[in-house]
Regions:
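Extended compositionally biased segments used for macromolecular assembly or nucleic-acid engagement
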Residues: 240-256
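FKBP-type peptidyl-prolyl cis-trans isomerase
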Residues: 90-100, 195-210, 273-282, 421-436
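Aromatic/histidine-rich interaction motifs
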Residues: 102, 107-187, 292-413
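Post-signal-peptide N-terminal segment of Sec-exported extracytoplasmic proteins
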Residues: 57-91, 95
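Extracytoplasmic
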Residues: 394-407, 433-674
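Bacterial Sec-dependent N-terminal signal peptides
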Residues: 27, 33-62, 78, 107, ...
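Sec-dependent bacterial lipoprotein signal peptides
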Residues: 1-35
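Extracytoplasmic/secreted envelope proteins and their assembly/folding machinery
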Residues: 55, 65, 69-72, 94-98, ...
Length: 674
């Protein structure tokens, strides 16, 4: 079948309809979770259970799916589908497979950028004559090693990669009053949730294309991105985002203890935020020359005419649109579809959700879902709640909305076939021209307490589908933003708890430096998260460690998990104080400590608010002027006693706060508790 859009509705209609779609999906998800937790399951309300394995499902319908059987066998995956496990198969029928093969250009696929042709492996229109490599790729594009019912989908990426190490992006379409779930805005699910012994089968109407073009070259495919593509071509920026993977993880095997599975390749991926031509046109920009003049207005004329120089205005303009790491829409900031059913228990309603990303310009971008406003369903870049920006000319360039794929494909007929997936990342359309202006950032957008999740600052995690998803254990060399200074320490990534639902653990005799994000030059108070205990709940003696900022010692050594009720910290529950903890906050600050934020709840503590939990603190480590250039925070293990033969040396680190000094000391508007 062929899915087409109906006539494009107004934005308000689109948003309302999408909201209703998602509400139905979330209601189904809740119902499923209730059934799963019940001791007595009403079988009449379950999905039809066939008693077949996934392999049986295919063989029993071989007249429709023989091509996929052939492809799965050639990829040496078919026997896997006869085993115990959890799999999701997106299943195109024979007609869809044949059509896909016939639609491929030739043996070679080229791009508009005249890059080296890509071998497709397709030498004839017959499935049996596909190359081994192409058969393998097609089969792997359609299989995921986890069960996914459609009720678990939300706008954005499916949590786990497919067997081809690619993200599948979910969106929606309505055709003739029928609702369709789309994969990569290409394949529609036409028969969903066929449950088998070892997984779920969703029948789709097309083969999911194994896209290999880079992000930059994928942008060039869409005429409605022609101006931004011209800027990429002029600056040669495609070279900066051309990597697909770097050092093979096989070379790390001697250094890893292999407690948890590590992705066999260390991919390098990128995310691009791109304006359609219509957005440029609305700002009087119709040509590349117009865009060059616009860039020089905001970024100056240094290296004028040398467009491949990183100091050139056009180069800076392009670079600010890219961040390292593959960041799906539903993980730009945390969302229920990106994190799972515990989201509503974990985050306190009404608090804004945000994250900060270092861009390839070497500056910051802030992403935010303003849940404290009536506009909390959207994600914005460089969001401001001020009625007017710090610089009045910036009014067109702040509160830049990232447009969901479903909405974007229905905004204009030209956008109908837009696919966000590239071979090395993702593309997100935006609704305003995105620029970096330091005066606006310092005076408005990031004139605030900035809280950076240590894990989200490591793009290797999102590039390899580990971020908020998979346990992993690594040497420091896996990350370019972490340096090993000495010792034999390892780094463990732990999803599921913490400020942004994850933590990094340092263990053994660790000595690591973490690169700090590129904040504007000014004086800051710097704090880190600190896990703790109290005397009632533990008698353990903990390891100690020393912090250094740019090789300068930060105060006295710290315990791995100090006792929060010690006199030198002084934590007490707010509800036993006469003023709900106001004076206590001042006393703790004088001792160099703060309670945890009140905007999220403690996952391990039964979802008690983090501020009311003795297990979470913030340690004030320095007040320093951070100049332009790199800055590094070092964690150095000092030693641990042996308790019953076990050395205690795990240090969980969650986030770092970098706070402009005037925010800390403002007597008129004290810093909030969020």
């Amino acid at each position: 079948m062929k899915i087409k859009n109906q006539q494009s509705p107004a934005r308000g209609d689109i948003k309302t309809r999408l909201f209703n779609m998602k509400r139905i999906l979330y209601t189904l998800a809740i119902a499923l979770s209730i059934l799963a937790c019940s001791d007595e399951i009403d079988k009449s309300n379950r999905y039809t259970f066939t008693g077949e394995t996934m392999a049986d499902f295919l063989l029993n319908r071989s007249e429709k799916y023989s091509h996929m059987i052939t492809l799965l066998k050639r990829a040496e995956l078919f026997s896997l589908l006869n085993t115990y496990g959890q799999f999701t198969l997106f299943l195109p029928d024979n007609e869809a497979v044949e059509k896909y093969i016939q639609e491929q250009d030739s043996i070679y696929s080229t791009t508009k950028d005249t890059e080296a042709p890509i071998y497709t492996g397709i030498t004839s229109p017959f499935v049996e004559e596909l190359s081994d490599s192409m058969a393998n790729v097609i089969a792997r594009m359609h299989l995921i090693e986890k069960n996914y019912h459609t009720a678990e989908f939300g706008e954005g990426a499916i949590g786990k990669w497919n067997f081809n190490d690619r993200t599948l992006v979910v969106s929606y379409k309505v055709v003739d009053e029928r609702f369709y779930i789309m994969l990569n805005n290409s394949a529609a699910i036409i028969d969903s949730d066929n449950e088998v012994e070892n997984g779920i089968v969703h029948v789709i109407d097309k083969v999911i294309d194994p896209e290999y073009k880079t992000v930059a070259n994928k942008i060039s495919e869409f005429r409605f991105f022609s101006l931004f593509h011209s800027a990429i071509a002029e600056t040669g920026f495609s070279n900066a985002v051309s990597e697909k993977f770097c050092r093979d993880s096989e070379s790390f095997k001697e250094e890893l203890q292999n407690y948890w599975k590590l992705n066999p390749n260390r991919y390098i991926k990128f995310t691009a935020f791109v304006e359609p031509d219509k957005v440029f046109n609305e700002n009087g920009i119709y040509s590349l020359d117009d865009l060059k003049a616009f860039a020089e207005k905001w970024y100056g004329t240094e290296a004028k005419g040398n467009y491949k120089d990183p100091k050139n205005a056009l180069y800076k303009f392009v670079a600010y649109h890219f961040v390292e790491g593959e960041i799906p829409y539903n993980r730009i900031v945390l969302s229920k579809s990106g994190t799972g059913p515990d989201f509503d228990k974990y985050y306190v309603a009404g608090h804004d959700l945000y994250n900060y990303y270092p861009t390839m310009q070497g500056t910051l971008m802030k992403a935010m879902r303003p849940l404290s406003t009536t506009d909390g369903r959207n994600i914005y870049l460089n969001y401001s709640k001020r009625a007017l920006p710090y610089n009045i000319e910036m009014r067109r360039h702040i509160n830049v909305r990232v447009i969901e794929l479903t909405e974007f494909t229905q905004m204009d007929e030209k956008y109908t076939d837009f696919m966000p997936n590239a071979g090395n990342g993702l593309i997100h359309p935006i609704d305003k021209i995105l620029i970096y202006n330091e005066n606006e950032m310092v005076g408005n957008i990031i004139n605030e307490r900035m809280r950076f999740d240590f894990a989200s600052l490591q793009p290797e995690l999102s590039s390899n589908n580990l971020w908020q998803n998979t346990y992993g254990e690594f040497p420091a060399e896996y990350f370019k933003g972490i340096k090993k200074m000495g010792g034999n320490g390892l780094i463990m990534y732990i999803p599921g708890a913490g400020y942004l639902l994850d933590n990094i653990w340092l263990y053994v005799d660790f000595d690591f430096s973490f690169k700090l994000p590129p904040v504007p030059p000014r004086t800051y108070e710097i704090r880190i998260s600190q896990q703790a205990h109290n005397h009632i709940n533990t008698g353990r003696t903990m390891a100690s460690y020393q912090l250094y900022l740019d090789n300068k010692i930060c105060g006295n050594p710290l315990l791995q998990e100090p006792h929060s009720d010690d006199l030198d910290i002084g934590w007490i529950e707010d509800n036993v104080t006469y003023d709900n903890g106001v004076e206590l906050d001042k006393q703790m600050r004088n001792r160099g400590w703060m309670k945890a934020p009140d905007s999220y709840n403690d996952y391990y503590g039964g979802f008690v608010n983090a501020r009311q939990s003795f297990s979470y603190l913030r340690k004030i480590i320095a007040r320093e002027y951070l100049s332009d250039g790199e800055h590094w925070l070092r964690f150095r293990y000092l030693g641990a006693p042996t308790v019953e033969g076990y050395r205690l040396f795990i240090l969980p680190i969650d986030y770092i706060e970098i706070v402009p000094l005037h925010i800390v000391s403002d007597p008129v508007k004290p810093e909030d508790r969020h």
